[in-house]
């Protein structure tokens, strides 16, 4: 089996534990959540799925984090279910769910 991880940014942008803060500081207009397989690096494993979350001009780290968490939860339930039911292949960095 493999481990999966959710990350609160659209990897490969903003790895590490401060994704929403880093996105706000950089001034991006879209951030989101990434579901990926775990490898030896920090947030560097093959990407399973991503979901976009718009950044509002009045967002705080807390408000953006909460919206990302909501999207992250939906994504996690959907894709872990698909991985279990349908399986997957990883070719290089590309994850395919049949």
Where on the chain are the PLM-derived regions?
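Donor/substrate-binding cores of folate-linked one-carbon enzymes
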Residues: 1-97
